[in-house]
């Protein structure tokens, strides 16, 4: 088992979980700022947004997790804020981040669809890296399997939990998001019929479908009346993505690739 603590500075312990999240954030900010001028968005506005959105998204991710595990946390109030042990629900962070983005874009007079389109691939790569935090914490894993011989030794050893090998669902989602990120990079440079909002829709459909399938493999899903919450939200995301495509096509939204770029 790998040590979840990356750096120990006296009483201060810096965990791999936190490093994975921060690394994903830094890369996401860099990529978003790089694409921002293409949509006539000031890069400094991206930094301003992150300073507001990131802490609120972390809070939203934790609140979401605590709400659906309230039976446990109501008896362990001191652990509610112990986010270094894991327990950040991605969907809670996404919902909070989307609300903050809408308000921020409105106040800065930025087109919301443009902002979402340049942020979507960055969010996907951040999620891909962030999932490795689950790896170090030995969480977000799946059912038992006989062996994991097809995986590198360090992953196989870390997925040996409670006397059994476990499906590395964190890895499946990380790779799924990485592939989605790569496809978006190709689409937004090559797909000339791509309209404003289509990248956001692709993210919602791609991530929603992948999460719905992978969530079914997990053994630690957040439940609500015997239903997997994330799977229901995944269906909502897929439906929302499809509606965005239909809506933007019908209103003949501007193309993502401008005439000057074609």
Curated annotation (Swiss-Prot):
Which lineage? Bacteria, Bacillati, Bacillota, Bacilli, Lactobacillales
Q: Where does a 1,2-diacyl-sn-glycero-3-phospho-(1'-sn-glycerol) bind?
A: 131
Fetch the NCBIfam families from UniProt: lgt
What pathway does the UniProt record associate with this protein? Protein modification; lipoprotein biosynthesis (diacylglyceryl transfer)
Which keywords belong to this entry? Cell membrane, Membrane, Transferase, Transmembrane, Transmembrane helix
**PROSITE patterns from the xrefs?**
LGT
Record-annotated membrane-spanning stretches: 9-29, 41-61, 80-100, 109-129, 167-187, 197-217, 227-247
Tell me which EC number(s) this protein carries.
Answer: 2.5.1.145
Q: Which family does it belong to?
A: Belongs to the Lgt family.
Intracellular or extracellular location(s): Cell membrane
Q: What is this protein called?
A: Phosphatidylglycerol--prolipoprotein diacylglyceryl transferase
Q: Which Gene Ontology molecular-function terms are recorded?
A: phosphatidylglycerol-prolipoprotein diacylglyceryl transferase activity
Q: Write down the superkingdom of origin.
A: Bacteria
């Amino acid at each position: 088992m790998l040590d979840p603590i990356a750096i120990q500075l006296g009483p201060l312990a810096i965990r791999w979980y936190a490093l994975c999240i921060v690394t994903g954030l830094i890369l996401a900010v860099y990529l978003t700022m790089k694409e921002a001028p293409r949509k006539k968005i000031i890069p400094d506005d991206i930094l301003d947004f992150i300073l507001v959105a990131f802490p609120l998204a972390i809070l939203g991710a934790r609140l979401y997790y605590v709400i659906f595990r309230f039976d446990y946390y109501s008896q362990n109030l001191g652990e509610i804020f112990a986010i270094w042990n894991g327990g950040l629900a991605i969907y809670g962070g996404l919902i909070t981040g989307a609300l903050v983005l809408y308000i921020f874009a409105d106040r800065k007079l930025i087109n919301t669809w443009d902002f979402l389109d340049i942020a979507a691939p960055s969010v996907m790569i951040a999620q891909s890296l962030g999932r490795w935090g689950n790896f170090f914490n030995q969480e977000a894993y799946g059912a038992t399997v006989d062996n994991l011989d097809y995986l590198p030794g360090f992953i196989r050893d870390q997925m040996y939990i409670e006397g059994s090998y476990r499906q590395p669902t964190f890895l499946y989602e990380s790779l799924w998001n990485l592939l989605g990120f790569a496809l978006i990079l190709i689409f937004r440079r090559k797909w000339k019929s791509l309209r404003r909002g289509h990248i956001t829709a692709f993210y919602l459909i791609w991530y929603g479908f992948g999460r719905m399938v992978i969530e079914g493999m997990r053994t630690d899903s957040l439940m609500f009346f015997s239903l997997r919450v994330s799977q229901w939200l995944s269906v909502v995301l897929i439906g929302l993505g499809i509606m965005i495509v239909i809506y933007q096509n019908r209103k003949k939204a501007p193309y993502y690739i401008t005439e000057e770029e074609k």
